[in-house]
């Protein structure tokens, strides 16, 4: 039996362009190195990512929808002077974890929650932390485990 080619959806919260570019570059390089296909949906902030992944997963079960094997969540949340940072960072992580567990979705977590922009850049750069690439690799690994443990492709 020939295994289907892996197809991922990257959902990126693009609130900090330079950092987002690096996260996306790392993720796409890792996916392409594996020979997988991917689509990208861009939203304005990290808090939207779990909702969009849930909608994409639901759409994939309709006749006209695209079925994805897994998802890569990319975004940046930088601490400010208010409680907003904690709300966005914590609820984004919680929403993604809830989706992954409840629906058994492979989701690579590449949402950076940092104190300052310099920290985000060093973690996002492909030549340094490559958190985008790490998120994509984690998703691909989880897809392999899902296929092994549950015998499921899409």
From Swiss-Prot:
It catalyses: (2S)-2-hydroxy-3-oxobutyl phosphate + 5-amino-6-(D-ribitylamino)uracil = 6,7-dimethyl-8-(1-D-ribityl)lumazine + phosphate + 2 H2O + H(+). The active site is at 84 (proton donor). Keywords: Riboflavin biosynthesis, Transferase. Its EC number is 2.5.1.78. Belongs to the DMRL synthase family. NCBIfam families: lumazine-synth (TIGR00114). This is 6,7-dimethyl-8-ribityllumazine synthase 2. It comes from Caulobacter vibrioides (strain ATCC 19089 / CIP 103742 / CB 15) (Caulobacter crescentus). The gene is ribH2.
């Amino acid at each position: 039996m020939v295994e289907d080619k892996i197809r991922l959806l990257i959902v990126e919260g693009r609130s900090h362009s330079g950092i987002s570019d690096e996260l996306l570059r790392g993720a796409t390089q890792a996916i392409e190195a594996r020979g997988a296909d991917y689509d990208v949906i861009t939203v304005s902030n990290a808090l939207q990512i779990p909702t969009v992944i849930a909608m994409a997963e639901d759409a994939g079960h309709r006749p006209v929808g695209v079925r994805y094997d897994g998802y890569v969540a990319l975004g940046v949340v930088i601490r400010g002077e208010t409680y907003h940072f904690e709300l966005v960072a914590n609820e984004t992580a919680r929403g993604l974890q809830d989706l992954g567990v409840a629906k058994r979705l492979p989701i690579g977590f590449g949402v950076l929650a940092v104190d300052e922009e310099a920290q985000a850049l060093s973690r996002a750069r492909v030549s340094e932390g490559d958190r985008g690439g790490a998120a994509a690799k984690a998703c691909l690994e989880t897809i392999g485990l899902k296929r092994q443990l549950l015998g499921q492709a899409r």
